[in-house]
Amino acid sequence: GWGGGAPASGPYGGPGVGASGGGAGEWAAFTHGADTPDAANFGEGVEIRLPDGSVVMAPNAAAAAAVRHALTQLGVPYQWGGTTPGVGLDCSGLTQWAYREAGLNIPRLAQEQDIGAAVAPGDLRPGDLAVWGGHVAMVVGNGTMIEAGDPVKLSPIRTSNAGQGFQGFWRPTA
């Protein structure tokens, strides 16, 4: 996360931030579960029901649990340095808490959450992390990710974030 508040034009605010110029549309085909070519590499996977009622397949139980926990925080206010579920979270506070609840300890700072295995954009699965130099978000499936904006919200998957350097997509459970 960043210091200060979260102005509408800042890294967390405003509809469509970072999703223009070939953003959301090209991601729509990813994370469709068992019909993806690499699904065999993950076995059956673990189902997750998203807020819209659709079902996606996480690669394993830890990733599924992390996504389920993260989704419970939708609407929670952004708080710089925040690590308290239901009260206030920053970006890395959200992802660290969700994975800790799933039994996996990951680093606190966003830019240090590029752990596990690097994942190609075409191989994204629920629970994978999108990591920037000062922000992190978690892929939930169907072309969306959850992130601590103001408040915690679902956004289209993207690789740009207010000019921050993108460190890639990562699977902490790999």
Predicted regions mapped to residue ranges:
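Catalytic cysteine-centered active-site loop
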Residues: 74-126
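Structural motif
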Residues: 127-128, 135
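Short acidic-hydrophobic sequence patches enriched in Asp/Glu that either
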Residues: 62, 90, 161-165
